Amino acid sequence: MNSASVSGESSLSDMIQTVHFSSGNPRIGETRGVMHLISDNAVSSSSSSSSSNLPIGRNPLVCVLGVPNHMTYADFCQFCGSFIQHILDMRTVRNDDIENRYSILIRFDSQESTDTFFQHFRGKQFNSLDEDVCRLLFALDVQFTGYSGSIDHTQPSAAGPIEQPTCPVCLERLDQDTGGILTTMCNHSFHCSCISNWPDSSCPVCRYCQQQPENSVCCVCQTTENLWMCVICGVVGCGRYKEGHARRHWEETEHCYSLELETQRVWDYAGDNYVHRLIQSKTDGKLVELNSHGSLSKDGCGSCEYSDSGMTDALLNSKVDMIISEYNELLQAQLENQKQYFEKLLQNVKEETEQKISEAASKAISQRLQKLQTRFDRCVKEKQFLEDLNENLVKNKDVWSTKITEMKEREKKAVRAKDEKIQGLEEQLGNLMAQMDGESEVSETKEVQDATVSTTNTSSSGAGNVIHANKKKSNRRKG
């Protein structure tokens, strides 16, 4: 038993993952710590919802790793859904080795709720538009290792009463029995229901934002050097000393003004010069270049310098107003060009869409017509076959009608011949019968004569017998 427990503890220790984290506003104070998580290898890959697939020795504490920075606290509370009522507290921390992401430690009111939450949200996407999935791990313990900052975090004396903190939004007590508590990255605590109504990712108290600004890169080659931004649409591209994607954007869209991000100077591709220092002359209304010493370029009046600071400020403000007005006019003209450009694009898209719809309709009609033509050809062939069959049947009918007529004639002739033959045979039979009767009468007469001569002494009884015999013979002839 002891060896089995030792082996189980060693296998569990092999599956423990150590993650270093920090929290707090780095400008004020930062708390560092380490948390021990049960790695994914300890969790069974089976899709069964049974708790037997979960690691042994787990606690009602889980960690959501790698939450995107663009996901606000309200978004995450909405993602948790109905499980929010089983959460005691949530703490947002910053991972040391992961950029633009944060992690959340969640403690539940029971192990059953923790297991259900783990099985339901493990590997689930945060939203349908984001490819990031929820990576959940069970946490064994969380340890704070140190603090660095300008604020002294000394522990209060244990002798005095400790006042329970309140929510900065609703000013109610932060009690886990009444609702879950969420601690932000800057170590400010709120009710989950209160922070769910906060629209952005900043802290409602100190406005610390966990989402850091992104570095500008070229939208094509992703370089970070020699970048120019289009003044009209904001597209960032690299300059001519790299791959020239900013100039290519001007050639494609005709947006001629581009801002150099490093020096904040504006370049005009159409005029092939800088336009950020152009002002309008009051004498003739022409655009002239602003001198760095506060003087104007030669416009027929020579150059002037002002020693009065008030006059210099007024002139500078006037020049700034003129530059702003000129910039607004240029921007309006570019916006009008942009409008025409996109209207043209929309018209082209509309025409292409109509053309595709027409082609699809023509293709569908052509396929339908082809099917109907195939069916028509099959029907024509079937009709021709039936006509040929009918013609053959008509011909066969005539032939067989002739044969039947001939057979009837032959049958009539045969019957007539048989009748004639039978009639002739009957006549022959009658003659033969008559001849036989005549011969029998002649023979009887001769016998009578012979009997009369030979029996002269017959008695009356014998004569009676002779008479009776003659009657029988006569009857037989008649029969």
UniProtKB/Swiss-Prot annotation:
Gene Ontology MF, one: zinc ion binding
Keywords noted in UniProt: Coiled coil, Metal-binding, Transferase, Ubl conjugation pathway, Zinc, Zinc-finger
Residues reported to bind Zn(2+) 2: C230, C233, H249, H255
Basic residues: bias regions: 469-479
EC id: 2.3.2.27
GO biological process, one term: regulation of seed germination
Pathway in which this enzyme or protein is active: Protein modification; protein ubiquitination
Zinc finger (RING-type): 167-207
ZnF endpoints (UBP-type): 201-294
Signal peptide range in chain numbering: none
Function in brief: RING-type ubiquitin E3 ligase that binds ubiquitin and is required for seed germination and post-germination growth.
Protein name: BRAP2 RING ZnF UBP domain-containing protein 2
Species of the source: Arabidopsis thaliana
Gene name tied to this protein: BRIZ2
